[in-house]
Amino acid sequence: KRYDTCVKLKNAPIKCSWTNLGLLDDIRALKMSSNTYQFYTAFKVANTAYYYDMPFAILNNAFEIYRNTFAEFGLGVKTGIDLPNESTGLKGKNDTSGLLLDFAIGQYDNYTPLQLAQYISTIANNGSRMKLHLLKEVYSYESQLQKLIYQNKIEELNKLNTDSQYLNRVQEGLKAVMSYGGTGSGYIDKNYLPAGKTGTSQSFVDTNGDGLVDTETVSNTFAGYAPYDDPKATFTVVSPDTYNYQTTYQSYVNKRITQRISQKYFEIYG
């Protein structure tokens, strides 16, 4: 456990969580979306002992360690979906030390909604990353008889290279996110036993048409699954530019979309 204390590196602004979250373990850090818990994890990955206002120089391949791990979940790599082309996202070009902290909280490399869907499905599937498909089956109807003429086969791309006890902790953390007081509370009806994770990232848009992408906004994401004890479906919602720092209006569209699509899914499929 550790307290949710801010981090200060030499010649860099102080970095904190969205509020002071008090004493944290890994479950509560996920539930409350702690930035600083991830910062200290990044220091461990970089084999660095943190102290206030320290110079930070990465002496190992910390970025590569993160990216290789994320790739096992489907982040930064192709999902294998049955489309002629797909993006692998956007990889940050500068691996300077301070950016590792941004990377650790999802504020550096960029991923597609499909990759987020595969990532959360991998967790729901207990570490099995499955190939994505838009098409499941094709049937023909002849003389009122139904005949299967094509079927996409279930294909496992890889298994997570981690001990099941650590994946279990992540799953417990995602359940906590959706519980009372968690950042995902209310996104999916609690009766469906959801697990998931909210995300908030800084983004920029051109608001006055001058060709400069210089207005800071916030984009929201959600990835989750239900029920957590026997997952039937995963849900991924990405809502860009939902909040503009120049206004007092804040949109909860990401939450509303998640509520509606999850509710409709379980109404139809049970």
Q: Regions from the language model: what does each represent?
A:
Residues 54-55, 129-130, 247-250, 260-264:
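Glycine-rich loops and low-complexity Gly/Arg-rich segments
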Residues 1-239:
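Beta-lactam-recognizing serine transpeptidase/beta-lactamase-like catalytic domain environment
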Residues 220-224, 231-233, 243-244, 257-268:
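Membrane-interface anchoring segments and C-terminal beta-barrel signals
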